Amino acid sequence: MKKTGVMNSNISRVIADMGHMDWLGVGDAGTPVPAETEKIDLSVRPGLPSFIDVLEEVLKELEVQKIYIAEEIKTENPKQLEAIKKTLPNVEIEFIPHSELKKDLKTSKAFIRTGEETPYSNVILESGVTF
């Protein structure tokens, strides 16, 4: 049995398979996931697990060089935006329209669905390198 880190075997597998500049999505319960993208559904009930809790755990194992966030989060969910910035203080952020973010999920290795139910609580993580 695994003792530390992300316990979900699907998330662990996807993270281990990530290469430089690969994408991994993490987001709220309402995000439409394209059929061609693997969906890892962690939602148990509304709010559980939270977006930030899942993001923090993923970041313990994944090197991230850049993130993509919906432009709309600035006005529709500024509290979540601040939490994301606090969680990823030294990572470049690119704001894109929410419609574009949803389309970009087609090229993500996977999407991790949380129980989060606040608007625009979605991010695409771009994998970096550890050297």
Curated annotation (Swiss-Prot):
Gene3D superfamilies: RbsD-like domain (3.40.1650.10). One of its GO terms (molecular function) is D-ribose pyranase activity. Catalyzes the interconversion of beta-pyran and beta-furan forms of D-ribose. The active site is at 20 (proton donor). It is an enzyme of class 5 (isomerase). It comes from Lactobacillus gasseri (strain ATCC 33323 / DSM 20243 / BCRC 14619 / CIP 102991 / JCM 1131 / KCTC 3163 / NCIMB 11718 / NCTC 13722 / AM63). The lineage of its organism: Bacteria, Bacillati, Bacillota, Bacilli, Lactobacillales. SUPFAM superfamilies: RbsD-like. InterPro entries: D-ribose_pyranase, RbsD-like_sf, RbsD_FucU. Belongs to the RbsD / FucU family. RbsD subfamily. Its EC number is 5.4.99.62. It catalyses: beta-D-ribopyranose = beta-D-ribofuranose. The keyword Cytoplasm applies. Keywords: Carbohydrate metabolism, Cytoplasm, Isomerase. Pathway: Carbohydrate metabolism; D-ribose degradation; D-ribose 5-phosphate from beta-D-ribopyranose: step 1/2. This is D-ribose pyranase. The gene is rbsD. Substrate binds at residues 28, 98, 120-122.
